[in-house]
From Swiss-Prot:
Pfam families linked to this entry: Toxin_3
Full protein name: Putative beta-neurotoxin RjAa32
Subcellular location: Secreted
Family: Belongs to the long (4 C-C) scorpion toxin superfamily. Sodium channel inhibitor family. Beta subfamily.
Tissue-by-tissue expression: Expressed by the venom gland.
GO MF annotation terms: sodium channel inhibitor activity; toxin activity
Cysteines joined through disulfide linkages: 11-72, 15-37, 22-44, 26-46
Free-text note on domains in this protein's UniProt record: Has the structural arrangement of an alpha-helix connected to antiparallel beta-sheets by disulfide bonds (CS-alpha/beta).
Function: Beta toxins bind voltage-independently at site-4 of sodium channels (Nav) and shift the voltage of activation toward more negative potentials thereby affecting sodium channel activation and promoting spontaneous and repetitive firing.
GO cellular component entries: extracellular region
Keywords: Disulfide bond, Ion channel impairing toxin, Neurotoxin, Secreted, Toxin, Voltage-gated sodium channel impairing toxin
Residue ranges constituting the LCN-type CS-alpha/beta domain according to the UniProt record: 1-73
């Protein structure tokens, strides 16, 4: 599946409209991935693939998002007003 990559602070990686930045961030965390800036969420969003053991082809995997909204709300507000 797809998901949001987390930064060192445990929050989603923030962005405004920079797909290339998000692609680099996603590929740094998961080698075989792609990424873009999800505008409405102001966060990078990744599509991650891994080889399936049966066919040796790439298949999507899930990214867990266990961070609460309140934990990162201040971080999101700072990003919105810093750009």
């Amino acid at each position: 599946k797809e998901g949001y990559p987390m930064g060192r602070d445990g929050c989603k990686i923030s962005c405004v409209i920079n797909n290339n930045f998000c692609k680099v961030e996603c590929q740094a965390k998961w080698r075989q991935s792609d990424g873009y800036c999800y505008f409405w969420g102001l966060s990078c969003y990744c599509t991650i693939y891994q080889k399936t053991p049966r066919f040796g082809i790439l298949a999507p995997i899930n990214v867990e998002d266990n961070v609460t909204v309140t934990q990162c709300l201040g971080h999101l507000i700072n990003v919105m007003y810093s750009h």
